[in-house]
Regions:
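N-proximal helix/coil linker or "cap" segments that precede and/or mark the start of modular domains
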Residues: 173, 179-222, 232-235
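N-terminal leader/linker segments that initiate helical-solenoid repeat arrays
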Residues: 26-74
Length: 246
């Protein structure tokens, strides 16, 4: 397997890990369902998902103008404009942006996202929408720009650190490892002893030791039988690595 293929496989794996990590983080606790407006917004979202599922099953393309996601994106955005600053509005904002991504309207989503103030609570979930859009188009420039701004000016500390580590991951996915390193180091320094710092430390270790094309670290050991083994001894030979945990 040549280096180009290895790099491609590594890139695909990194992208999958990137999305899975962010999706895992997204499993935060939803707002308490004691607000009728939350129920109202959730009902709209449920109906949008139902109609979107029917649209997909019909074989229609996401970019078609009759995609119901477009209709519901408009409806949810209108709700946002009429009810600013509420928990329900934060959810409506995120879902409106997400539906535009699902309808392949990335530019329109970005235009609307630019109207969401950096101090809004909606960013706690809306960042995931930007990640999804970036992964779909394999274009991380907008995600980098927005998370960079949020990491500097967001009011909510959780949004701020989340934006910062997402910024590092976006740089990493784009292939700008030095910029990613700087972002991850900032997370470790500014948010010590947090899950985000632990994740950033793990990412830094991968950048340092596991990037394709890097020189493998030298080592010399003995087997359980007492035979010497060293890296140079494997040159030109097929090697099977077996890992196990205890």
């Amino acid at each position: 397997m040549n280096r180009k293929i290895i790099a491609q496989l590594f890139g695909s794996l990194l992208g999958l890990m990137f999305l899975l990590t962010l999706m895992t983080r997204a499993q935060d606790k939803p707002p308490k369902p004691d607000d009728p407006e939350l129920d109202r917004v959730q009902a709209m979202i449920s109906q949008a998902k139902k109609e979107s599922g029917q649209f997909s099953k019909s074989g229609s393309k996401a970019s078609e103008p009759n995609n119901p996601n477009l209709k519901w994106a408009v409806t949810l955005w209108e709700y946002r404009n009429k009810h600013p600053g509420t928990p329900a509005t934060a959810i409506a904002t995120t879902e409106a942006l997400r539906l535009l991504v699902r309808a392949d309207r990335i530019s329109e989503m970005q235009t609307k996202a630019d109207t969401v103030k950096l101090d809004e609570a909606a960013w706690k979930r809306a960042i995931y929408v930007l990640v999804e859009a970036a992964a779909n188009k394999k274009d991380y420039n907008y995600l980098i720009s927005k998370t960079q701004a949020l990491s500097q000016t967001a009011v909510d500390p959780e949004i701020k650190v989340f934006a910062h580590i997402t910024l590092g991951e976006a740089y990493w996915k784009k292939g700008e490892t030095e910029q990613a390193r700087v972002a991850f180091q900032a997370v470790v320094a500014q948010y010590p002893k947090t899950p985000y710092a632990e994740e950033a430390e793990g990412n830094l270790m991968e950048i340092e030791l596991l990037n394709p094309g890097q020189t493998a670290p030298q080592f010399a050991r003995t087997t359980i039988k007492g035979d010497p083994i060293f890296l140079a001894g494997f040159k030109g030979r097929v090697v099977v690595l077996k890992f196990w945990g205890t």
